[in-house]
Amino acid sequence: MADMEIQSNKMSITEETQVQTRKECGKRGRKPGRKTSTEKLDMKAKLERSRQSARECRARKKLRYQYLEELVADREKAVVALRTELERLIQWNNQLSESNTPTNNDQLLQELGILKQE
């Protein structure tokens, strides 16, 4: 039994010294402000890659916005064309409702595909 107490005392003493040595070490990891020249070059290369990536991202964004603006302009032109066609068809419908023959009857029938060109 005495042997066990001696061993447990030795273990507790060694554990205390290990805890004390760990506490003495302080912070782990690299010391701040001590970068080697390769680390500085790596950081510069990383920074340049980041800048290049940002430039490419801005260029892609600019192209995307240009494409969308062209798409909107094309759709607006299509809307204007459809509105003029709608107004023309409404006028033609009103003339037919009044039992009048439309002035450009043949042209309209050709456009609709009812009358074939001669």
UniProtKB/Swiss-Prot annotation:
GO terms for cellular component: chromosome; nucleus. Residues 40-90 form the bZIP domain. Residues 82-89 are annotated as: Leucine-zipper. Residues 1-20 have a biased composition (Polar residues). InterPro entries: bZIP, bZIP_sf, CREBL2/REPTOR-BP. Residues 36-53 have a biased composition (Basic and acidic residues). It is found in: Nucleus; Chromosome. It comes from the Eukaryota. Keywords: Activator, Chromosome, DNA-binding, Nucleus, Transcription, Transcription regulation. Residues 40-77 are annotated as: Basic motif. GO terms for molecular function: chromatin binding; DNA binding; DNA-binding transcription factor activity; protein heterodimerization activity; protein homodimerization activity. Disruption phenotype: Sensitive to nutrient stress. Larvae display no obvious phenotype under normal feeding conditions; larval growth and development is normal, and there is no effect on triglyceride and glycogen levels. However when mutants pupate and become adults they display reduced triglyceride and glycogen stores leading to adults dying within 18 hours of starvation whereas controls survive 2.5 days without food. Larvae are also sensitive to nutrient stress displaying 50% lethality when fed a low nutrient diet. Residues 1-53 are annotated as: Disordered. The keyword Nucleus applies. Homodimer. Interacts (via C-terminus) with REPTOR (via C-terminus). Transcriptional regulator that acts in the TORC1 signaling pathway to regulate energy homeostasis and promote survival during nutrient deprivation. Interacts with REPTOR to form a transcriptional activator complex that functions downstream of TORC1 to up-regulate the expression of most target genes induced by TORC1 inhibition. In the complex, acts to enhance the binding of the transcriptional activator REPTOR to the regulatory sequences of target genes. Belongs to the bZIP family. ATF subfamily. This is REPTOR-binding partner. The lineage of its organism: Eukaryota, Metazoa, Ecdysozoa, Arthropoda, Hexapoda.
